[in-house]
């Protein structure tokens, strides 16, 4: 087998069978499937056997252990050279696996590749991320630069770097930061690999206070990981103080006349000042250069009354190819 599709499953709804049908319909058939039945009652074996006609393995947990445990168990069981991520209630086009395997074949230097995804529920939006390794690494200061459900990766990379507990609902972001620090090479292939379902996502875990807490925590973790020489006391207070403003401004970015844009701008300007001060003391730190460029780019987008999330794929990230960032040994 050329690849294994790994799928953590917890309380999948009626769309589960549709997702399995998408696996059956793939134009590339040289793959198997590893599913984690994460304490579901009744077990999922009957539903899987009735629908999935691909070689597969089900790892059964007697009780719910969470997505990190499910992903790690699935990945540990993979023997194929490539791991492909999928969620239990999402959909994918029939050429997804073929296109991602072809990309990895044609780019042997790339370890992890993501793609765009169409997000649907109350509407339809396209989430597109930066394409090049340098752009992805620079953008990691602000947010995850790969759409997690779209990722395909070399098995040896993921088996050597399991997902970590302790980053609730941000386990992918933490992993990308760790891999970036170690010189793993990223890419995004900008085709739509997944139709991502947002329905049923509005739990208490996604409320404003929970989002704020995760935002501050992961933003600080990003700085500590990507900028190991940074003075945490210097950089993180601005992040903490500005987090409420940034959170309030996220939705406001849809409206170019919203005062939320000004709040995001002020926070970005404060962070940029701190980054520039750090860069003057550590001119050898390539990550700080990337962070400064990413922050200036974000400011330019805000000042142009554009959204920073790159929805609809209309925003082109600035190039960072002139920077010297960590590479694999």
Feature names for model-found ranges:
Residues 320-327:
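Conserved small/polar residues in nucleotide/adenosyl-binding loops
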Residues 134-218, 229-238:
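Conserved nucleotide-sugar donor-binding catalytic segment
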Residues 61-78:
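Glycine-rich, basic loop-to-helix element that forms the pyrophosphate-binding segment
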Residues 83:
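Short aromatic/hydrophobic "clamp" motif used to bind/position activated sugar donors
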Residues 97-126:
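Conserved donor NDP-sugar-binding/catalytic core segment of glycosyltransferases
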Residues 37-46, 63, 87:
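A conserved acidic beta->alpha catalytic loop
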Residues 43, 90-102:
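Acidic donor-binding/catalytic loop of UDP-sugar-dependent glycosyltransferases
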Residues 21-30:
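Short, acidic, metal-binding catalytic loop of nucleotide-sugar glycosyltransferases
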